[in-house]
Regions:
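N-terminal leader/targeting pre-sequences
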Residues: 6, 18-61, 66-169
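Bacterial N-terminal signal peptides that target proteins for export
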Residues: 1-7
Length: 169
């Protein structure tokens, strides 16, 4: 009877040593402080997955980026700083020298002001290290007024910052 109990104890101690899948939920607010939805972030094998549940946004294509500071002071959200860029690269997926870690693909808001969908960023993490969205106290997620052109430095001509949420543990 001791062997099964010891085996169970060993299994439980190994399971306790394995970290739970990292995830966090971010609430986004507009420039007036009104909640416009949430984004769930979770660790993937390579990078971070995002599930968008947004509402009350202008219809059309919008840029979304991770920004370097865990601040979202309205009305312009400039307190979030520039794009999260620990690798020190230029902006845009079409840049031959690489892109910011915080650059992501555009997403579409429907005619009713809603956006529900998945995105990913393979150049960030929810773990430890320089690419962690939790480094230096966290980061911010910014939704921009326009689409990212994926090439123009520093932000892809993506327009004003219209929604912001702080990413922390």
């Amino acid at each position: 009877m001791k062997t099964p109990i010891l085996s169970l104890a060993a299994l439980l101690s190994v399971m306790a040593a394995v970290p739970a899948a990292a995830k966090t939920k971010v609430e986004l607010k507009d420039a007036q402080g009104k909640a416009v939805g949430t984004i769930m972030l979770w660790a993937e094998k390579s990078g971070v997955g995002l599930q968008l549940h947004l509402h009350d946004l202008p219809p059309g294509e919008h840029a979304i980026h991770f920004h370097q500071n865990p601040k979202c002071d309205p009305p312009d959200f400039k307190s979030a700083g520039g794009h999260f860029n620990p690798a020190g690269k230029k902006h845009g997926f079409e840049n031959p020298d690489g892109h910011h870690n915080g650059d992501m693909r555009n997403f579409t808001v429907d005619a009713n002001g809603k956006a529900d969908g998945k995105l990913e960023d393979k150049d960030v993490s929810l773990g430890d290290g320089a690419n962690s969205l939790f480094s230096n106290g966290g980061t911010a997620i910014i939704v921009h007024a326009k689409a990212d052109d994926y090439k123009t430095d520093p932000s892809g001509n993506s327009g004003d910052r219209i929604a912001c949420g702080v990413v922390t543990k």
